């Protein structure tokens, strides 16, 4: 099969849980982002043990943008750590649905210890050169359009954790 020949058995195994995401557009963003991590040879784990059927009340494009930004930020941080000589980097993510119209996504990645999280969501505040990293400000702007979307993130013991809960 095309996927097996081009991705390898270990990559296909890592994508296995995406089969539980029953929305093709949502599933494709996870496959795309996980493949990007795989291509950069970064350790990762994705878990989606529950069937994702009824999406919560959020525009699908907004949900995909938030998930995409979270993965892009994690991947960029891990690549930057690699360039600075830190080879032990990883990205772990999880998608979970315990009831219809509820959804939780969490991504946790290796990060610099001095990452300051209390200002990252402010527009124009970034840890990146040339102020390229406005992703979390964009995430906050999107989340603020909804009363049922909760965003949380923290940096602890060399890991950055980003969570979105939608009820």
Predicted regions and their residues:
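Conserved glycine-/histidine-rich ATP-lid loop and adjacent helix of the Bergerat-fold HATPase_c
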Residues: 138-150
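Heptad-repeat coiled-coil segments of the DHp/HisKA dimerization-phosphoacceptor module
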Residues: 46-50, 97, 111
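Short beta-strand/loop element within the Bergerat-fold HATPase_c
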Residues: 84-100
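Glycine-rich/acidic phosphate-handling loop/turn and adjacent ATP-lid/helix
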Residues: 100-133
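Short C-terminal beta-strand
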Residues: 158-167
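Conserved ATP-binding N-box helix of the HATPase_c
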Residues: 60-84, 145
């Amino acid at each position: 099969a095309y996927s097996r020949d081009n991705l390898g058995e270990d990559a296909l195994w890592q994508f296995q849980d995406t089969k539980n995401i029953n929305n093709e557009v949502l599933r494709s963003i996870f496959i795309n982002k996980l493949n990007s991590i795989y291509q950069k040879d970064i350790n990762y784990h994705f878990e989606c043990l529950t069937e994702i059927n009824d999406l919560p009340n959020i525009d699908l494009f907004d949900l995909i943008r938030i998930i995409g930004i979270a993965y892009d930020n994690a991947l960029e941080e891990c690549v930057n750590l690699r360039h600075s000589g830190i080879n032990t980097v990883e990205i772990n993510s999880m998608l979970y649905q315990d009831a219809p119209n509820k959804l939780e996504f969490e991504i946790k990645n290796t990060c610099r210890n001095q990452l300051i999280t209390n200002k990252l969501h402010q527009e124009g505040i970034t840890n990146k050169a040339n102020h390229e990293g406005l992703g979390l400000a964009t995430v906050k702007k999107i989340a603020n359009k909804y009363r049922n979307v909760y965003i949380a993130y923290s940096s602890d013991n060399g890991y950055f954790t980003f969570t979105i809960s939608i009820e």
